[in-house]
């Protein structure tokens, strides 16, 4: 069976590299005695796949993992929840045969800063070229308060930019990947609710 797990990578865990995050997931699954399905060959590995890696330092609330299992019970999930660190919790689990890497087309981000700035005119270097941030977003919203500003936007997978490069160096900010989205703009968690079987309720926060 194929199962999709959603984790929330936050707190100090947001500073883990992609490889360290993958190792954390694999190690936690083994400790929780998940009945993993392995690849064939001389060096078998758990059959699992991940969505796009987010830059180190970005809070990732959409850390989805697709794994192949022999079976799954609530006991496995309870074991996993006890094994995981508090700043890398399990937020949802679904039995679903859909390939999430074929379903997801974009991501929704939130950027919180203590000041106002013109993000849309910012240019970021990507693969040796200066690319305008405004040209890479599908939608863009700004919410201003007395002491901070919240920028919310969506970017397609093929045009992802490191949100940490959008703010001034040494300034305070929080960059968050809120959710992965389908072609229609539906949250991946909602898509999994419709097309799969929920094993664990999706957590908020």
Q: What are the roles of these predicted feature ranges?
A:
Residues 7-9, 66-72, 111-115, 151-157:
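Short beta-strand-to-loop capping motifs
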Residues 14-19, 71-74, 161:
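Ordered, soluble secondary-structure elements with a strong preference for glycine-centered loop motifs
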Residues 36-43, 91-95, 133:
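A short, aromatic/hydrophobic, helix- or strand-capping loop or linear motif
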Residues 37-67:
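Short, charge-patterned binding micro-sites
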Residues 121-205:
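Core RNA-modification/binding signature centered on pseudouridine synthases
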């Amino acid at each position: 069976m194929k199962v999709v797990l959603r984790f929330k990578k936050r707190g100090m865990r947001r500073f883990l590299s992609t490889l360290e995050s993958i190792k954390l997931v694999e190690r936690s699954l083994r400790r929780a005695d998940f009945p993993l399905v392995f690849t064939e060959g001389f060096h078998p590995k758990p059959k699992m796949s991940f969505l796009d890696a987010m830059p180190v330092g970005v809070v990732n609330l959409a850390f989805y993992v697709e794994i192949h299992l022999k079976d799954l019970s609530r006991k496995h999930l309870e074991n996993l929840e006890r094994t995981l660190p508090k700043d890398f919790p399990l937020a949802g689990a679904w039995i679903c045969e859909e390939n999430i890497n074929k379903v997801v087309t974009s991501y929704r981000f939130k950027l919180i800063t203590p000041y106002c700035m013109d993000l849309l005119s910012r240019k970021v270097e990507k693969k040796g070229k200066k690319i305008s941030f405004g040209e890479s977003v599908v939608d863009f919203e700004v919410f201003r308060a007395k002491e901070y500003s919240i920028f919310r936007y969506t970017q397609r997978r093929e045009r992802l930019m490191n949100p940490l490069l959008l703010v001034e160096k040494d300034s305070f900010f929080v960059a968050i990947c809120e959710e992965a989205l389908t072609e229609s703009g539906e949250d991946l968690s909602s898509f999994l609710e419709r097309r799969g079987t929920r094993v664990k309720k999706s957590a908020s926060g």
